Amino acid sequence: MRTRAAVALAPGKPLQVMDVNLEDPREGEVLIEIKATGICHTDEFTLSGADPEGLFPAILGHEGAGVVVKCGPGVKSLKPGDHVIPLYTPECRECPSCLSQKTNLCTAIRATQGQGLMPDGTTRFSMLDGTPIFHYMGCSTFANHTVMPEIALAKVRDDAPFDKICYIGCGVTTGIGAVLNTAKVEIGAKAVVFGLGGIGLNVIQGLKMAGADMIIGVDINDDKKEWGEKFGMTHFVNPKSLPEGTSVVQAIVDMTKTPFDKIGGADYSFDCTGNVKVMRDALECTHRGWGQSIIIGVAPAGATIETRPFQLVTGRVWKGTAFGGARGRTDVPKIVDWYMDGKIEIDSMITHILPLDRINEGFDLMHEGKSIRSVVVF
């Protein structure tokens, strides 16, 4: 069949909207009509050419929602008409990682997914002249139709709006999940969030759900203060506005001191920036003896993090998280329910709705800092 897609032909170049060929689903695969897709910083990272694993030509996009059109042989959990959210972190429920219950990082299709291919080592997309087009993160939601493995699709309720729940495919789950699944924040905790973009706001939302008492947002853009407060932030710090000689670490330690606890420091911190210097600050502002710092942001290729070993010897912990520690097929439907039940907010984060032909405007809005999340609808 033919479908419409925004194709990344080369790094650093705008996406080109065109008709492409799409083959039918094979064994264990599903054809999806994508109804809406978010534009994420990860898509931008690859499109820019900074991603060492970036492949071209490719159909990017990994934050979508749509409807099952056709199932290949052997598919048991889905049928035509089902509403689904694509998962860049699948859940096969059979590999050692899934069975361990210690991680959400399913390894069933990781090797081929990283090569921009389907599990059988081939691609379903091609140019009209037959040139193969790579898949992206196993999803390729910048196409009106895509083919994905059954294990990488979460079935969700039919009454949830596609242009909102697509955000659950990455940003919402990554932020909220980092709080609830990875850090396991408890009622009354003091927490700090570095970087108040889409992920950071969802971390704040997760902290509010968890019952954190003190939620400190850190950003160099004062405009983010209003956004943070909307989702539950209680305090705001702009490192550029601190008195001369006062570091952001010292400011946070001082803010979290009490008459009972004169040491100070956050119980939890979350880095949503991908900046390795900020990651160090995020660790070192946590409390001696038990502070946990969760790394969410993706750093540039080759970047390394550092701190004095004494910071770790004295009880602080560095943790990483991917997709918020969520097991996609199990957890994503629950998060959709939370949204539909009014337990989490998504609507106000979708700041721009665009047709596919204007997808490059969504990237421009991201670069200019004018959007939280732009969504393309088909």
Stretches with model-predicted labels:
Residues 1, 259, 280-284, 325, ...:
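C-terminal hydrophobic helical "lid"/dimerization subdomain
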Residues 286-288:
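Helix-to-beta-strand junctions that scaffold the AdoMet/dcAdoMet cofactor pocket
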Residues 193-196, 208-281, 302:
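Adenosine-nucleotide cofactor-binding segment
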Residues 200-201:
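N-terminal Rossmann-fold NAD(P) dinucleotide-binding loop
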Residues 94-194, 242:
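NAD(P)H dinucleotide-binding glycine-rich loop of Rossmann-like/cofactor-binding domains
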Residues 297-315, 333:
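Rossmann-fold NAD(P)-binding glycine/threonine-rich loop
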Residues 23-37, 50-99, 104, 112, ...:
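Glycine-rich beta-strand-centered segment in the early N-terminal region that forms part
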Residues 290-292, 316:
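Glycine-centered, small-residue-biased loops immediately flanking beta-strands
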